Each structure stands twice: as structure tokens, then as C-alpha cells.
UniProtKB/Swiss-Prot annotation:
<keyword id="KW-0813">Transport</keyword>
<feature type="transmembrane region" description="Helical">
    <location>
        <begin position="34"/>
        <end position="54"/>
    </location>
</feature>
<dbReference type="GO" id="GO:0033644">
    <property type="term" value="C:host cell membrane"/>
</dbReference>
<dbReference type="Pfam" id="PF04138">
    <property type="entry name" value="GtrA_DPMS_TM"/>
</dbReference>
<dbReference type="InterPro" id="IPR007267">
    <property type="entry name" value="GtrA_DPMS_TM"/>
</dbReference>
<keyword id="KW-0472">Membrane</keyword>
<protein>
    <recommendedName>
        <fullName>Bactoprenol-linked glucose translocase</fullName>
    </recommendedName>
</protein>
<dbReference type="GO" id="GO:0000271">
    <property type="term" value="P:polysaccharide biosynthetic process"/>
</dbReference>
<feature type="transmembrane region" description="Helical">
    <location>
        <begin position="10"/>
        <end position="30"/>
    </location>
</feature>
<comment type="similarity">
    <text>Belongs to the GtrA family.</text>
</comment>
<comment type="function">
    <text>Involved in O antigen modification. Involved in the translocation of bactoprenol-linked glucose across the cytoplasmic membrane.</text>
</comment>
<feature type="transmembrane region" description="Helical">
    <location>
        <begin position="90"/>
        <end position="110"/>
    </location>
</feature>
<feature type="transmembrane region" description="Helical">
    <location>
        <begin position="65"/>
        <end position="85"/>
    </location>
</feature>
<dbReference type="GO" id="GO:0005886">
    <property type="term" value="C:plasma membrane"/>
</dbReference>
<keyword id="KW-0812">Transmembrane</keyword>
<dbReference type="InterPro" id="IPR051401">
    <property type="entry name" value="GtrA_CellWall_Glycosyl"/>
</dbReference>
<keyword id="KW-1133">Transmembrane helix</keyword>
Length: 120
């Protein structure tokens, strides 16, 4: 399990760079609300994360159902964190750090035990 989490974390670093880049562009370049910026960053980064983790972490085939399950769960998590950040007037950097930490742990657990549960 630790080896899987290490692989998931490695892909998560790349995913985080993608997410944070899009988030920064939306907040600072387009002046959007954090909820929209966080969700936009998520949408772009989640596809990379799903396919990379399916292939390199879980050695699994990708299916539309698995993709929809992963995107649905992680998208809801992203929107909730962004909405809460707006409600609390959190600085964007705190929002990014918070979402990155929550999504790493929750995403791994959800992927391992729900999305790719029949693998390995």
C-alpha cells in the first residue's frame, strides 16, 4: 500500500503543478472567484491524474465509468473546497494548499478502494 501511495504522490506532484498553474491564471489573470478557479484547475488536471494513475499506479484499464466516478468525486471535492474558501475569504495560496492536501489523501483512498478496487 505504501508503494502505491508513493506512486500516487509522485503523479500528484505533477497534477498539482498543472492545477496550481491554471488556478493562478484564473484568479490573477482572469480575476475569477476561487471556486471557479479551483474547479477549472481541477478539470484540466484531473484527466492527467486519472490516466497517469490508472496506468502507472494501479496498472488498470481506463473506462468511461471509472473516469466519471473519479471526476465526479474529485470535482465535488474541488467545488466544496473552493466554495468554503470563498465563504471564509481565504487567501488563494491557502486554498491551493488545503485542496492539494485533502485531494491527495481522499483521492488516493477513493481511487484505491472504489474506482480501482478490483485491481491487484
Amino acid at each position: 500500500m505504501l508503494k502505491l501511495f508513493a506512486k500516487y504522490t509522485s503523479i500528484g506532484v505533477l497534477n498539482t503543478l498543472i492545477h496550481w498553474g491554471v488556478f493562478a491564471f484564473c484568479v490573477y489573470g482572469m480575476h475569477t472567484h476561487q471556486a471557479l478557479a479551483n474547479f477549472s484547475g481541477f478539470v484540466i488536471a484531473v484527466s492527467f491524474s486519472f490516466y497517469a494513475n490508472a496506468r502507472f499506479t494501479f496498472n488498470a484499464t481506463t473506462t468511461t465509468l471509472r473516469y466519471m466516478m473519479y471526476v465526479g468525486f474529485m470535482g465535488t471535492l474541488s467545488a466544496v473546497v473552493g466554495w468554503m474558501a470563498d465563504q471564509c475569504s481565504l487567501p488563494p495560496l491557502i486554498t491551493l494548499i488545503t485542496f492539494s492536501a485533502i485531494s491527495l489523501v481522499c483521492g488516493f483512498i477513493y481511487s484505491r478502494f472504489i474506482v480501482f478496487r478490483d485491481i491487484r
